[in-house]
Amino acid sequence: YVRVDLNHSDLIEIEDGVHIAGDCRLLCHKKELAEYKQGMTYGMMPYKYGKIHLCKNCAIGTGCIVMPGVTVGEGAVVGAGAMVTKDIPAWTLALGCPAKVVKEFPKDDPKYVSKKSQ
């Protein structure tokens, strides 16, 4: 299953060919911890909202969490268990928590071009 922020599903854009593996979460809201002050309760902290944009043919691995305000670029791959807190550029591999780009897949390099797409 994939958990989608249904209260704010209008903030989620998923283009054609996107793969989202099981146990992922797409969150369009989070508590704004930067606003935390001594004496505040968790319930007093404001929410921050942001759009999630999953571009054409990107892939989100099992158990990933995609946070608000993030774009995953065309053809990008996010490895299993990653927490995506910032944009992931097109044609890259991002891993970890928080997700960081560890590899690029140059579009003009034949090694990374599928024969099916030619």
Where are these regions (language model features)?
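C-terminal/domain-terminus segments
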Residues: 70-93
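Acidic/histidine-enriched, glycine/proline-rich intrinsically disordered or flexible terminal extensions
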Residues: 110-118
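Flexible, glycine/small-residue-enriched loop-and-beta-strand segment within the central core
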Residues: 1-71, 97-98, 104-106, 110-111
